[in-house]
Amino acid sequence: YVTAKDYGESGPIPMGCHGGGGVAITWQDKDNYWTFEPYIGNYSACNTPPLGEVPEETWYHVVGVWDGTGSAGAIKLYLDGEIKAERAPAKGNSFQFPGNKWFVIGGDAGAANEADRAYKGQIAVARIYDRALTAEEVKLLYDTLEE
């Protein structure tokens, strides 16, 4: 559950490290959309449609799901409890972290053992699961936050 101080200049909410394999949920300020980017051997991204003008400090519940079954699986992006994008991952995907030492929320685990690309906003809730969530589970998480 996130908000940006300024959606025009918020930056990414990366987790892990793109260089060695990782995932990122990112706000794309040029066209105002969210993207879920699992970098799992090959680049695969899933994007919401452009959201138009976004008022400052608008909160979003953003969930990225990769079912972990390689190129036979699916990458999904949910926004406020609803699926907004889905695609098959690029061929050859596998989760690899050969050189990574850190896992970062709100920045990228940089090569110099320090976080970089810091997110400019607030992250109220961040969760990581050891399995792919179903659409029903994502909706329940959103409904629970809204209560």
Segments and roles (model prediction):
Residues 1-147:
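Extracellular glycan-associated modules
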